[in-house]
């Protein structure tokens, strides 16, 4: 019955796609920064720490701005688009040095946490109370599949086209996630009454 709910189905499909996009790039971010940007191990470690800090900021932004229907719709679009944009900007950022990488990582980290908590929030909003735990478990399982799928896609792209193409591939997949949200998820959220 969960997959018959258009909102939940769109969330599950969208989760698979955006998690794949995210981890297509993130799984290879260290060798990417080493090979493309020539960053040292210390610089990469510092950059990844900023990634984590940005995730915490994303949680605070969610708590502050994820209220009201229109804000929720825009928040979802913006967080997904931010992940895709960050992946698309990784090549010029890596070539531009550590400052550019940090800026992109802030965007990526904030938006990565933002879409995750937003999707979990909508699952709880639209899943029947008796099935909320199952819906959340399905979401977690799909997200984990996306992690594995992203790693596999990144590896295949790196082998076929070189490390420099990995984040571009992630950006294209991320753009598909934005399209799913705009064409299917948000219209379904507008049509479907949340569970009280």
Regions inferred by a protein language model and the residue ranges of each:
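Intracellular helix-loop hinge segments at the cytoplasmic ends of transmembrane helices
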Residues: 31, 117-126
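Loop-to-transmembrane helix entry
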Residues: 36-54, 100, 134-138
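Residue-level signature of mid-helix packing/kink "hotspots" within the transmembrane helices
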Residues: 52-60, 147-148
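Multi-pass alpha-helical transporter architecture, strongest
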Residues: 169-196
């Amino acid at each position: 019955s969960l997959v018959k709910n258009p909102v939940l189905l769109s969330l599950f499909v969208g989760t698979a796609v955006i998690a794949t996009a995210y981890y297509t790039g993130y799984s290879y971010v260290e060798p990417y920064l080493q090979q493309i940007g020539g960053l040292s191990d210390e610089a990469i470690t510092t950059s990844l720490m900023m990634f984590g800090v940005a995730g915490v900021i994303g949680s605070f932004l969610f708590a502050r701005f994820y209220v009201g229907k229109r804000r929720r719709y825009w928040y979802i679009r913006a967080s997904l688009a931010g992940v895709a944009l960050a992946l698309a900007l990784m090549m010029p950022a890596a070539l531009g040095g550590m400052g550019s990488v940090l800026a992109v990582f802030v965007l990526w980290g904030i938006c990565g946490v933002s879409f995750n908590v937003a999707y979990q929030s909508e699952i709880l909003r639209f899943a029947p109370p008796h099935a909320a735990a199952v819906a959340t478990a399905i979401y977690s399982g799909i997200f984990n599949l996306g992690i594995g799928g992203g790693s596999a896609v990144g590896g295949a792209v790196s082998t076929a086209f070189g490390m420099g193409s990995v984040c571009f591939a992630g950006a294209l997949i991320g753009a598909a996630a934005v399209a799913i949200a705009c064409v299917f998820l948000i219209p379904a959220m507008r049509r479907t009454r949340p569970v009280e």
